[in-house]
Amino acid sequence: ALKFDFGSLVADGAPLRVVGNLPYNISTPILFHLADYADKVKDMTFMLQKEVVMRMVGDPGTEEYGRLSVMLQYRFNMRRVFDVPPGAFRPAPKVMSSIVRMVPRPAAECTAMDYALLGKVVTAAFGQRRKTLRNTLRDYLDEADFAALGIDPGLRGERLSVDDFVRIANHVAAKGPQPA
């Protein structure tokens, strides 16, 4: 699943509907791989560990909000549909599960000039959660850049919206070549 070309399943331009019970230990890499096919998908519905779903749908300023939240919410409108208790399985797992529905956002709403750069900026911002943006994004932005963006460099990444991250990435992309 991590190397499969999901685009090869698209027939006559009909979008895919992806449904599954993802292996909890590799769910995040699978979700990132599937995000690359958002333009070929009508919707996706998965059962995952509840903790992962809460991170996927996390809001800015919450403990759950992080890299997974930003990168998936950039590409998808998501909602937790319902929880599945351990007792629904035999043998019962030690964790609660949740069902999440993911619908790709229209391409017009996905305005990052460079998706890979967006990923790098988000990864940097959340790489050290307790550090401020001034420190985590110092390879990308200086004080003048923060001022131009209207973003307080004293904030932490968890306080920024998905759109804030897109604005930062687009600003950085417009400045030219970036660090490796």
Annotated model-derived regions:
Residues 1-123, 147, 167, 177-180:
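Catalytic cores of RNA-modifying enzymes
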Residues 104, 122-180:
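C-terminal lobe and adjacent flexible extensions of AdoMet/dcAdoMet transferase-like proteins
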